UniProtKB/Swiss-Prot annotation:
Cofactor comment: Binds 1 nickel ion per subunit.
Protein name: Putative nickel-responsive regulator
Organism: Dictyoglomus thermophilum (strain ATCC 35947 / DSM 3960 / H-6-12)
Function: Transcriptional regulator.
Keyword list, A-Z: DNA-binding, Metal-binding, Nickel, Transcription, Transcription regulation
Length: 135
């Protein structure tokens, strides 16, 4: 387990009151626990800006399965990025729409390229990416 370091933070009173309300509503046991989560989130967001950093995450997309050639194009793209794709989940949302969740792990630069390539396809209706640090 990593050593815990204590440090002090000075903030405006109203900022602290608002923060305390939020962490109470979310069920945090302490300010320290909430601040640690915020720090981790900030670090992960910053890593997303550094091409050589390694991250893990998921890319989700919704598309119409009956558009000619789209499923094949998505499969081709995924094969091209086999080194960062861990797994893929395919779900039929209704008779027309499919959702895929692609689990990824690797360098930010390559994962961004994969995400951009998928999200730029004409009949992909929505894409979203969620990343985390490999801690």
């Amino acid at each position: 387990m990593t050593k815990i370091v204590r440090f002090g933070v000075s903030v405006e009173e109203d900022l602290l009151e608002n923060f305390d309300k939020i962490i109470e509503n979310k069920g945090y046991n302490s300010r320290s626990e909430a601040i640690r989560d915020l720090m981790r989130d900030y670090i992960i967001k910053e890593k997303w800006n550094i091409k050589s950093e390694k991250v893990a995450g998921s890319i989700s997309l919704i598309y119409e399965h009956d558009v000619y050639g789209l499923s094949e194009k998505l499969t081709d793209i995924q094969h091209h990025y086999h080194d960062v794709i861990i797994s893929t989940l395919h779900v039929h949302l209704d008779e027309k729409n499919c959702m895929e969740v692609i689990l990824v792990r690797g360098k930010v630069e390559k994962i961004k390229k994969l995400y951009n390539e998928i999200s730029s396809l004409k009949w992909v209706r929505h894409t979203n990416i969620s990343i985390t640090d490999i801690i």
